[in-house]
Regions:
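Cell-wall polysaccharide-cleaving catalytic domain and substrate-binding groove, primarily
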Residues: 1-136
Length: 136
C-alpha cells in the first residue's frame, strides 16, 4: 500500500467541500480543514483548494513529518493505521499508540528497552518495531 493509495482513500471518504455547522473543523476541502490549510500556506478560498495541495499536505503532515514513512518500510499495515489515526486524532496521538503498544509487547524489556514517550518515530521506535516483526 503506497501513500498515494492511502491518500486517495482518505480523499474518497472525505469528498469535496464541506462547511457543516456540526463539524468543529469549519470549512474543509478534501478532508483538510481551513486551519491546517492556512498553517501550510494556502491563502485562497477553501472551496478552491486544489487536490494536489491537499495531497501535499497529507504527505508532509501526516506521513513524512511524523515518520510514518519509516514505519511503512517495515510494517506497511501499521503505517496505514498510523496515517489514518494521525489524520483523525493527530500524529502525536497515533505515535503514542504505537509506542505504548510496543512497550506493552516487549515482555518487561526482555526484547528491547522501552521506547520513550516522545511523539517522534525515532531509531529506537523502528528497532522495537523490527524486533516485534521478528517475533511474530
Amino acid at each position: 500500500m503506497t501513500i498515494d493509495t492511502l491518500i486517495d482513500a482518505v480523499i474518497g471518504r472525505e469528498g469535496g467541500y464541506s462547511n457543516h455547522p456540526a463539524d468543529r473543523g469549519g470549512p474543509t476541502r478534501w478532508g483538510v480543514t481551513e486551519a491546517v490549510a492556512r498553517a501550510n500556506g494556502y491563502r485562497g478560498d477553501m472551496q478552491a483548494l486544489p487536490r494536489d495541495e491537499a495531497v501535499a499536505i497529507y504527505k508532509r503532515l501526516y506521513w513524512q513529518r511524523p515518520g510514518f514513512d519509516r514505519v511503512a518500510a517495515h510494517a506497511p499495515l501499521i503505517a496505514a493505521e498510523l496515517f489514518d489515526t494521525g489524520i483523525n486524532m493527530g500524529p502525536a496521538t497515533a505515535t503514542g499508540f504505537l509506542k505504548r503498544a510496543l512497550n506493552a509487547l516487549n515482555r518487561n524489556e526482555a526484547d528491547y528497552d522501552d521506547v520513550d514517550a516522545t511523539p517522534v518515530i525515532d531509531d529506537a521506535t523502528i528497532a522495537a518495531l523490527r524486533s516485534q516483526r521478528r517475533c511474530s
